[in-house]
């Protein structure tokens, strides 16, 4: 039966139900001890003395499965399932457990070490993971994959229900090896077979259009702030009198990188307010020093995939009236995650706080509304048209 591709939304209630089932299955299928918690709490990062969770219900499920389940049990897989289930049951899409492989991929991607792939950037749009753009001179672009395509299969495995990170890990592989990606475009399936290549994916680069400097930032990693500060120091040599900061399709990264970037426009100013149940309220400010772009005419480009640290940047520049924001309403990720390294190379990413802009605006689930709203369609992207950039250049 042919699958119908419609925009979809998963309700929070359904997500919690699914996650709760995952938790029970993850805990139940593999333990050989009659007491789950006391034997495996150390693997979960918990202690029996400090926990007030009643684990007897899970013990009951386990005991029944332990006496009836017909199959081999892999303890490491079960422990990973238990950890993932505990986290997924929270129903927070930003709080995730990563096994050692996923954690390694996450760190590599955050630092731009994506290895070998086909050169596509993906993100969640209208309920599906879609191609946001294809990188120039890379296999996906040459094969004909387009922005807006839904990622349906990788090597004949259906992946459309997986997360962006999970799909990305399946697309990557050995340099020179083949991968077949099936996409859905206008309701029709199209398959593309490509050879993986080493992908060079820097976090920031600058181009010049006359006296306008166009800075594109694809993510906020450890080097981003330093790179852009280096660009800015050369602006006088190019006679720059306007900066366009392109944050479109930038899903964020390190808050500290946004802090370094904003120090080009703000000196010792508050850039966000954090509100946390466990850590209390706090503020983050830029370093005190010469903000060399403080008086520079600045336009920031944003869209629906501009999120997290990118929204911190756009929100602060908008609040302080240091820039004109152009494009589409941003994603609306007004929460902060901290990374915690766990045993065995695993990792926990946990939502630890809400964040507001310097003027105490909450953007979570709402996004930042541009000062000038202009849409850029998938058709525009695929035909190399950019009305948002053209507007920014005209200001």
Q: Which stretches of residues belong to each language-model region?
A:
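PDZ/PDZ-like domain segments forming the peptide/carboxylate-binding groove
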Residues: 51, 113-153, 157-161, 222-225, ...
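Extracytoplasmic/secreted proteins, especially bacterial periplasmic and envelope-associated proteins
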Residues: 53-60, 64, 77, 81, ...
């Amino acid at each position: 039966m042919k699958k119908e591709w419609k925009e979809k939304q998963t309700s929070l209630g359904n997500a919690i139900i699914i996650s709760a089932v995952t938790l029970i299955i993850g805990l139940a299928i593999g333990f050989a001890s009659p007491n789950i918690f006391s034997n495996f709490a150390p693997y979960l990062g918990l202690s029996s003395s400090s926990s007030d969770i009643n684990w007897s219900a899970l013990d009951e499920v386990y005991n029944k499965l332990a006496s009836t389940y017909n199959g081999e049990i892999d303890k490491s897989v079960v422990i990973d399932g238990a950890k993932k289930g505990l986290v997924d049951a929270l129903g927070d899409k930003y709080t995730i457990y990563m096994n050692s492989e996923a954690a390694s991929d996450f760190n590599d991607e955050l630092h731009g070490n994506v290895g070998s792939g086909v050169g596509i950037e993906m993100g969640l749009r209208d309920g599906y993971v879609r191609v946001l753009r294809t990188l120039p001179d890379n296999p996906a672009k040459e094969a004909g994959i387009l922005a807006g395509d839904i990622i349906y299969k990788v090597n004949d495995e259906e992946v459309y229900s997986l997360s962006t990170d999970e799909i990305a890990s399946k697309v990557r592989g050995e340099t020179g090896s083949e991968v077949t990606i099936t996409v859905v475009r206008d309701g029709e399936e199209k398959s593309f077979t490509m050879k993986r290549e080493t992908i060079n994916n820097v976090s920031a680069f600058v181009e010049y259009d006359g006296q306008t400097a166009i800075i594109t930032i694809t993510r906020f990693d450890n080097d981003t702030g330093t790179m852009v500060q280096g660009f800015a120091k050369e602006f006088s040599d190019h006679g720059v009198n306007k900066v366009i900061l392109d944050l479109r399709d930038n899903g964020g990264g390190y808050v500290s990188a946004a802090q370094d970037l904003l120090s080009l426009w703000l000196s010792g100013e508050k850039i966000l307010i954090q509100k946390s149940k466990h850590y209390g309220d706090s503020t983050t400010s830029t370093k005190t020093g010469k903000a060399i772009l403080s008086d520079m005419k600045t336009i920031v480009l944003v869209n629906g995939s501009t999120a997290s640290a990118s929204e911190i940047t756009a929100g602060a520049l908008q609040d302080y009236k240091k820039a004109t924001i152009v494009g589409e309403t941003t994603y609306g990720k007004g929460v902060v995650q901290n990374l915690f390294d766990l045993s065995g190379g695993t990792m926990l990413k946990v939502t630890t706080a809400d964040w507001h802009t310097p003027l105490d605006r909450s953007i979570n689930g709402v996004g930042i509304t541009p000062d000038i709203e202009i849409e850029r369609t998938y058709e525009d992207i695929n035909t190399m048209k950019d009305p948002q950039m053209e507007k920014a250049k005209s200001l």
